[in-house]
C-alpha cells in the first residue's frame, strides 16, 4: 500500500501527491513544490523587469509599534512581581464582591509569576539545579451565571503582562468529530502572543463553561460521549503539561500539515463553570435535609438561595465526580474557589461603584450630548431588585438599563433644550418617562403686563 494519499492533488497543476516531492496543505487547498518554484520565477521576472525599466521600488512602510500588554511586569525579578494584595486591589477597583475568588486568583497568579521567575533563573544558571521543582496549580471557579467569573478573568488580562486567552469549552469535541480540537485553545493564546511561542508558553488560559463537558452519567458509557468525557480526556495532558501540536490556521489537524509545537507545562489554566445541581449532590452527601437546606416537594426540590454557598463550601472532589467530571481532570485542577451569587446590595454596588460601572458608562454617553444624567437611589435599588428577580446575575443589569434608556437615548441627541435627565423609581417600575430639566434659555418667557 502506498504511503501517499492518491486523492490529494495540487489545486493549481492537478498533480497527485505521488507525482511531486512536497504537497503543502492550506485551508481547503493544496500546492506542490513545482508550483511554488514557478511562482518564485514569475515574481523574480517581474522584479527584474521593474528594475530594468527604472521603476521606483515600493516605499517600505514602517513596522507597527508592538502593542504593550499589561503593566510592564514581563520577566521581572521576584521583588518586582505584583504582590497578591496589589493584584486583589486592582480586582477590587473593577469587580464588586467575590472576596474568596479574588484571593484565590491573586495568590495563584502571584505564584505563577514566581514560578516563571524561578524557571528563568534556573535556565540561566543563577539557581541551583538541585533545588525543589515548583509545579503549577490550576484553578477551578464555581458559581452561578452572571456572578463575575469571566469578568474576574478578563480583569486579570488587563493587569498581567503575560498572554491571556479566553476559550469556551462548549465548542470543543473529541478528535475526529465535528467541532474544535482542544489544541485550538492554545491557538488563541498563540495569537494573543503575536505567534511568539516562548511568550505563549508563559501565558494564562481561562476555559469558560467547563461544567458543560461533564459526562452524561457517573458510570462510563459504552457509547461515545464526544463533547463530554472525550473532551475531558483530551484536556488531561494539556492541563498537566505536554508538547501539543497546534495547527497555525486553526480547525482540524491534517496529517500532512505543518504544526506549531507548544509546551503547556508553564501555562496556567483557570476553569470556570456554573455547575447547576452540584449543591444538591453535596446536600445528599452531608445529609442536611432535616436542617432546612432544601425544601422538598414531591420528586423535585429547590435549594434556598442563601444556603447554596454554605453547601458549596463543603464540596469535596467526589462531588465533582458525581456531577460528571472524571477524577483525572479533578486531580489536575487542585485549587477550587466558590464564587457567591449576587444579592440586591451587591447588584446596586455593581451599578454604581466600579471604574466601568454601567451608570458611569451612560453618564459618559449623555455627557457627550451635553446632558447630565442622574439615577435616584431608589431607582438604582429598583433596577437591582428587578435584576435579582430575573436570576441571571449582573448580566440582567445591562438589559434593564438598556430598556430604560432606549427612549431617552433616542430623543435627547435631537434636543438642545435639555440640561439634565433623571431616572426615577417610577420610571423603573412603571416604565414612565424620565424627568427632564430644560435649559433656562429655552423656558417660555413670562408675558409682560
From Swiss-Prot:
Ranges where the record places region Disordered: 51-76
Self-association state and partner proteins as the record states: Component of the ClpX-ClpP complex. Forms a hexameric ring that, in the presence of ATP, binds to fourteen ClpP subunits assembled into a disk-like structure with a central cavity, resembling the structure of eukaryotic proteasomes.
Organism per entry: Trichodesmium erythraeum (strain IMS101)
NCBIfam families: clpX, PRK05342.1
Stored SUPFAM superfamilies: Glucocorticoid receptor-like (DNA-binding domain), P-loop containing nucleoside triphosphate hydrolases
Ligand binding (Zn(2+)): 10, 13, 32, 35
Family designation: Belongs to the ClpX chaperone family.
Family matches, as SMART domains: AAA, ClpB_D2-small, zf-C4_ClpX
Binding positions (ATP): 144-151
UniProt keyword terms in alphabetical order: ATP-binding, Chaperone, Metal-binding, Nucleotide-binding, Zinc
Gene it is expressed from: clpX
Domain of life: Bacteria
Name recorded for this polypeptide: ATP-dependent Clp protease ATP-binding subunit ClpX
Function according to Swiss-Prot or TrEMBL: ATP-dependent specificity component of the Clp protease. It directs the protease to specific substrates. Can perform chaperone functions in the absence of ClpP.
GO biological process, one term: proteolysis involved in protein catabolic process
Signal sequence, renumbered to the chain: none
One cellular component (GO) term of this entry: HslUV protease complex
Gene3D superfamilies hit by this protein: 1.10.8.60, ClpX chaperone, C4-type zinc finger domain, P-loop containing nucleotide triphosphate hydrolases
InterPro entries linked to this entry: AAA+_ATPase, ATP-dep_Clp_protease_ClpX, ATPase_AAA_core, Clp_ATPase_C, Clp_protease_ATP-bd_su_ClpX, ClpX_bact, P-loop_NTPase, Znf_CppX_C4
PANTHER family, per database record: ATP-DEPENDENT CLP PROTEASE ATP-BINDING SUBUNIT CLPX-LIKE, MITOCHONDRIAL (PTHR48102:SF7), ATP-DEPENDENT CLP PROTEASE ATP-BINDING SUBUNIT CLPX-LIKE, MITOCHONDRIAL-RELATED (PTHR48102)
Amino acid at each position: 500500500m502506498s504511503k501517499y494519499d492518491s486523492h490529494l492533488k495540487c489545486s493549481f497543476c492537478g498533480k497527485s501527491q505521488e507525482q511531486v516531492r512536497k504537497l503543502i496543505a492550506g485551508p481547503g487547498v493544496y500546492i506542490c513544490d513545482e508550483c511554488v518554484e514557478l511562482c518564485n520565477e514569475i515574481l523574480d521576472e517581474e522584479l527584474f523587469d521593474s528594475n530594468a525599466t527604472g521603476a521606483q521600488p515600493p516605499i517600505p512602510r514602517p513596522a507597527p509599534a508592538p502593542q504593550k500588554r499589561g503593566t510592564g511586569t514581563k520577566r521581572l525579578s521576584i521583588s518586582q512581581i505584583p504582590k497578591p494584595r496589589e493584584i486583589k486591589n486592582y480586582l477590587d477597583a473593577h469587580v464588586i464582591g467575590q472576596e474568596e475568588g479574588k484571593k484565590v486568583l491573586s495568590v495563584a497568579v502571584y505564584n505563577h509569576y514566581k514560578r516563571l521567575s524561578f524557571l528563568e533563573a534556573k535556565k540561566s544558571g543563577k539557581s541551583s539545579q538541585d533545588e525543589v521543582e515548583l509545579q503549577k496549580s490550576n484553578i477551578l471557579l464555581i458559581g452561578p451565571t452572571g456572578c463575575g467569573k469571566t469578568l474576574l478573568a478578563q480583569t486579570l488580562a488587563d493587569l498581567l503582562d503575560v498572554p491571556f486567552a479566553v476559550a469556551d469549552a462548549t465548542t470543543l469535541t473529541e478528535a475526529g468529530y465535528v467541532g474544535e480540537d482542544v489544541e485550538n485553545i492554545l491557538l488563541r493564546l498563540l495569537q494573543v502572543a503575536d505567534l511568539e511561542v516562548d511568550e505563549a508558553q508563559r501565558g494564562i488560559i481561562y476555559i469558560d463553561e467547563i461544567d458543560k463537558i461533564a459526562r452524561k452519567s457517573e458510570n462510563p458509557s459504552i457509547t461515545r460521549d464526544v463533547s463530554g468525557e472525550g473532551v475531558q480526556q483530551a484536556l488531561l495532558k494539556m492541563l498537566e503539561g505536554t508538547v501539543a501540536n497546534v495547527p497555525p490556521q486553526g480547525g482540524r489537524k491534517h496529517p500532512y500539515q505543518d504544526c506549531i509545537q507548544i509546551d503547556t507545562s508553564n501555562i496556567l489554566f483557570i476553569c470556570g463553570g456554573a455547575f447547576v445541581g452540584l449543591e444538591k449532590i453535596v446536600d445528599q452527601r452531608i445529609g442536611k435535609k432535616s436542617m432546612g437546606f432544601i425544601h422538598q416537594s414531591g420528586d423535585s426540590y429547590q435549594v434556598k438561595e442563601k444556603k447554596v454557598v454554605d453547601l458549596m463550601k463543603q464540596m469535596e472532589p467526589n462531588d465533582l465526580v458525581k456531577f460528571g467530571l472524571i477524577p483525572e481532570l479533578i486531580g489536575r485542577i487542585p485549587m477550587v474557589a466558590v464564587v457567591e451569587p449576587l444579592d440586591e446590595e451587591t447588584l446596586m454596588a455593581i451599578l454604581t461603584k466600579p471604574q466601568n460601572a454601567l451608570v458611569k458608562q451612560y453618564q459618559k454617553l449623555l455627557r457627550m450630548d451635553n446632558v447630565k444624567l442622574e439615577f435616584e437611589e431608589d431607582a438604582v435599588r429598583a433596577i437591582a431588585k428587578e435584576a435579582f428577580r430575573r436570576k441571571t446575575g449582573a448580566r440582567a443589569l445591562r438589559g434593564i438599563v438598556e430598556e430604560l434608556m432606549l427612549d431617552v437615548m433616542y430623543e435627547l441627541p435631537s434636543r438642545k433644550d435639555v440640561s439634565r435627565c433623571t431616572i426615577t423609581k417610577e420610571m423603573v417600575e412603571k416604565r414612565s418617562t424620565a424627568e427632564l430639566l430644560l435649559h433656562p434659555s429655552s423656558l417660555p418667557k413670562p408675558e409682560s403686563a
